[in-house]
From Swiss-Prot:
SUPFAM superfamilies: Ankyrin repeat
Mapped ANK repeat ranges: 22-62, 63-96, 100-133, 137-170, 174-207, 211-241, 245-278, 282-313, 317-347, 351-384, 387-420, 424-463, 470-499, 506-542, 546-578, 674-704, 708-738
Keywords, ordered alphabetically: ANK repeat, Repeat
Full protein name: Putative ankyrin repeat protein L88
Pfam family, one: Ank_2
The organism of origin for this protein: Acanthamoeba polyphaga mimivirus (APMV)
Entry-linked InterPro entries: Ankyrin_rpt, Ankyrin_rpt-contain_sf
Length: 879
């Protein structure tokens, strides 16, 4: 009886014991509750007496069941045969399928043992049920009956369907026939009698399914029923039939060598002439299948060997039966048997693996280290190398997958050599260093223990691979993923801390490189490792192939918070004066990063206040020995930088720079091969006054010349956009009168190289400083002189350059700033009179009394110095 509540149109009710559905009609409800009520069938008859109710007799519920499907499925259990009959009489359709494609006839055939099946099936067939209808899997009523003839269905049902012309060789979606279904289930749900019946009615004994398998193959695969095998063979089953993978019946039977009666089945097939050396598409024989799948049952293996199976036959990949057994078996017994029968223990397959190789890398899957021990005891080559690596390395490779640390220990205990390199030049230890990184944190402890085990068994931490790496440099290459414990372990076992790779990078250099752009967490880890390496004696001055030391790498970093590392490196005697291949010193790197930050920081002022219109340049006065300008150098003080959110980073970078500048071994005026100092470099690339002032405050010499003869002033006038940088250099006693190698002084060099605006500012500040022209041949050159000829010299330069069309605009800008009464031609009367005045004021009598000036004396009507004095005073207001 179905245990259900009262009928509810929206309720959920059972279609049969294990399947519930919504959408039940009142008729469906009356059917499943028929035997709950003594008048159950009468209620159904009464309900169907109403023509209105009959109209909905074929209505489906949500699972696709009709009232007839439910009645047939539960006939004899919840309802009666009489109910099935009245439904058919009232017009219930026999071929309506539920959502799984099952018709009432299929239900009846499957369940005929419990539902008055013979009578129900006859009744359904009488009312036009399609005997060959298929469900969604392609199963027919005959297939269901044949599969279950010894359980839910019956032999009689199968015969009834066959007598009513059911198609005996129809196939389901997988290509299985009724005979195949019966053979698959003969041990449990079907019977030999059913198979004999199907064969009697003409079932095709050698029909094949979608995989090319026959009924005999299915029998060998699933039943292991000796009587069935003999029946099929006696009825003409093809013993040498081959499925689409090339498997024969003997291979299939050998594959299930651990099953009941498997030995007898194999023996029957062999005795009936099955080819014991047949091969499938992988060239595997029945013996190979028996070895691969037998596990602890060796009977079939022994039988095949006794029947003459070749123990050394190889498959497509050159695997032998021993290799397959060592790879897949969970028992040592098949391996023992094969070895006792003379199997070659050191045969290798196409990948170079012997039986021990494969036993080791699969030791975790089978949880059996006894196979490994047996193969070693029987003389397997423990140091065999496959196409790439040794057995020990392969075992370590599969740690956490197919192998385990116990297997590694067994190998090491039996003298496996951890120092044999693989084809890439890496030993087992070097391989594990990479695996330690690759596997990540989840397997870190496991890999750490394996590395320690290898070191305990004399693995050489200083073995050098083809990339010139030892274990420490190999790990350090992945410095962002390394923790300090593994580094400590290698150091404890004597790894060479200063070994370098092909790029001349030591572990210290590699970790410093990682600090350049690492995140906070990684940076913290790398810092600790750097400190450890220094404590353990790492050479702080190793130079890599780019010419960088640890200090220069750190100084080039974008990370502002590396003061402690810089301090630590310097404390360990890092050389701050090295030059890399880019001709940079650590100081140059550090000041350039500081300058870069200042330039790109939005909150740093881009223009420091300056007085570019000043008529004086205090640097010239200072250099000449005159009194300092009233404008103090402190106007350039870094304290003027307004406080902002970037101030902490500015302070960090400034601190790093000052630390290096103040270190006792730092040569602030150190020159590279091109003669460039940190100050020259900064003046050449920067518009920021702060880093330049830091250098000058710490003793940078502004008058050092590079290989071109250029000083900081030369660099500044050419590259900077700010007159303040030039003025700052002058305030720190930069000499504006130093010549370049090509004979150019500062002003003429500025005129040639600097921007128009800068040249105007430079020239304006030189007007009141003593200069003169060297010669008529080099009119644009201005040099220091005791003579007060600066205005004339400037005019001469302007007059000369005004002839150059491209520079005429500069002349136009400067000329209004010169006294308007001075004419352009220096040989004119006014120019000569002005020169005479200046010579007199300087007291240069020798230069006044010349033949050239006699014409002027005559013009002025003077005969002595007193008259000349009066005349000069008189004409001062007119020239």
């Amino acid at each position: 009886m179905a245990t259900v509540g009262e009928y509810d149109v929206d309720g959920e009710f059972p279609c049969y014991t294990y399947e519930y559905s919504k959408g039940f009609t009142k008729l469906m409800y009356l059917i499943i509750t028929e035997k709950n009520n003594p008048n159950g069938h009468k209620n159904i008859v009464s309900y169907l007496s109403d023509k209105k109710n009959v109209k909905s007799i074929n209505q489906k519920n949500k699972k696709g069941y009709t009232a007839l499907s439910i009645a047939v499925r539960n006939c004899g259990n919840w309802c009666s045969y009489k109910t099935v009959r009245i439904l058919l009489e009232k017009g219930a359709k026999t071929n309506i399928k539920n959502n799984e494609g099952i018709t009432p006839l299929i239900f009846a055939s499957f369940n005929s043992r419990f539902c008055e099946g013979f009578n129900v099936i006859n009744l359904l067939l009488k009312y036009g049920a399609d005997i060959n209808a298929r469900d969604n899997n392609g199963y027919t009523a005959l297939m269901n009956a044949s599969s279950n003839s010894n359980s839910s269905s019956t032999y009689t049902t199968v015969k009834l369907l066959l007598d009513n012309d059911a198609n005996i060789d129809d196939k389901d979606k997988n290509g299985l026939t009724c005979l195949m279904h019966a053979c698959n289930n003969v041990t449990l749900k079907s019977s030999i009698g059913t198979i004999e019946l199907l064969l009697y009615y003409g079932a095709d004994i050698n029909a094949v399914d979608n995989n090319g398998r026959t009924a005999l193959m299915h029998a060998c695969d699933n039943s292991n029923n000796i009587e069935l095998i003999e029946l099929l063979l006696n009825r003409g089953a093809d013993i040498e039939a081959v499925d689409y993978k090339g498997l024969t019946c003997l291979m299939i039977a050998s594959k299930y060598a651990g099953s009941i009666n498997s030995v007898e089945v194999v023996e029957i097939l062999i005795n009936r002439g099955a080819n014991i050396e047949a091969r499938n598409e992988k060239l595997r024989t029945p013996l190979m299948y028996a070895c691969k799948y037998s596990h602890n049952n060796t009977s079939v293996i022994k039988l095949l060997l006794d029947k003459g199976a070749n123990i050394e036959t190889t498959d497509l990949r050159n695997n032998t039966a021993l290799i397959l057994a060592s790879t897949y078996s969970s028992s040592v017994e098949p391996i023992k048997l094969l070895l006792d029968k003379g199997a070659n223990i050191n045969h290798t397959n196409d990948e170079g693996c012997n039986a021990l190789n494969l036993a080791c890398i699969n030791s975790s899957y089978n949880n059996n280290s006894e196979i490994v021990k047996l193969l070693i005891d029987r003389g397997s080559n423990i140091n065999n190398m496959d196409s790439e690596r040794t057995i020990l390395t392969s075992t370590c490779e599969f740690i956490g997958k197919g192998s385990n640390i116990d297997t590694v220990k067994i190998l090491l205990d039996n003298n496996a050599d951890p120092n044999i390199p693989n084809t890439n030049g890496n030993t087992t230890l070097l391989y594990m260093c990479k695996k330690y990184i690759k596997d990540g944190p989840k397997k870190r402890d496991l890999n750490f223990n394996v590395i320690k085990l290898l070191l305990d068994y004399k693995a050489n931490p200083n073995f050098i691979n083809k990339k010139n790496e030892n274990s420490l440099t190999r790990l350090s290459k992945y410095s962002d993923k390394v923790d300090i414990e593994i580094i400590k372990l290698l150091l404890d076992y004597g790894v060479d801390i200063n070994s370098t790779n092909n790029y001349c990078n030591s572990a210290l250099l590699l970790f410093c490189m990682d600090l350049q752009n690492s995140c906070t967490k990684i940076s913290y880890n790398c810092k600790n490792i750097v400190k450890l390496l220094l404590e353990k004696g790492a050479d702080v001055n190793i130079i890599n192939s780019n010419g960088n030391t640890a200090l220069s790498i750190i100084c080039e970093s974008d990370d502002n918070n590396l003061s402690d590392i810089i301090e630590l490196l310097l404390a360990h005697n890092a050389n701050p004066n090295t030059i890399n291949k880019e001709e940079y010193t650590p100081l140059m790197h550090l000041i350039e990063r500081f300058d870069y930050f200042l330039t790109n920081s939005k909150s740093i002022p881009q223009n420091i206040e300056s007085d570019s219109d000043s008529d004086s340049m205090s640097g010239f006065e200072s250099y000449r020995g005159f009194s300092q300008s009233s404008k103090s150098v402190n106007k350039y003080n870094l304290d003027k930088i307004e406080k902002n959110k970037n101030e902490p980073e500015i302070n960090y970078r400034q601190k790093n720079l000052e630390m290096l500048l103040k270190h006792k071994t730092t040569k602030i005026n150190f020159q590279n091969s091109s003669g460039i100092t940190a100050l020259l470099h900064e003046c050449q690339v920067s518009d920021n006054i702060e880093p330049i002032k830091l250098l000058l405050d710490n003793g940078a010499d502004p008058n050092i010349q590079d290989e071109k003869g250029e000083t900081a002033l030369h660099k500044a006038v050419r590259h900077t956009n700010k007159i303040d940088v030039i003025k700052l250099l002058m305030d720190y006693h930069a000499n504006p009168y130093i010549f370049r190698n090509k004979g150019q002084d500062l002003l003429s060099y500025a005129f040639k190289k600097s921007s128009r605006r800068n040249f105007v500012n430079i020239a304006k500040n030189l007007i009141n400083n003593p200069c003169h022209v060297l010669s008529d041949e080099n009119r644009s050159q201005i040099f220091e002189s005791k003579d007060k000829e600066n205005i004339i010299s400037i005019i001469k330069m302007l007059e000369y350059n005004a002839k150059i069309k491209a520079k005429f605009d500069v002349t136009i800008d400067l000329m209004p700033q010169i006294a308007t009464q001075i004419i352009y031609n220096h040989k004119s009367l006014r120019a000569r009179l002005l020169k005479l005045k200046w010579l007199y004021m300087c007291g240069d009598i020798d230069k006044i009394i010349t033949l050239e000036n006699f014409e002027l004396f005559d013009y002025l009507c003077v005969e002595n110095m007193y008259q000349l004095h009066d005349k000069i005073i008189g004409i001062s207001d007119h020239i």
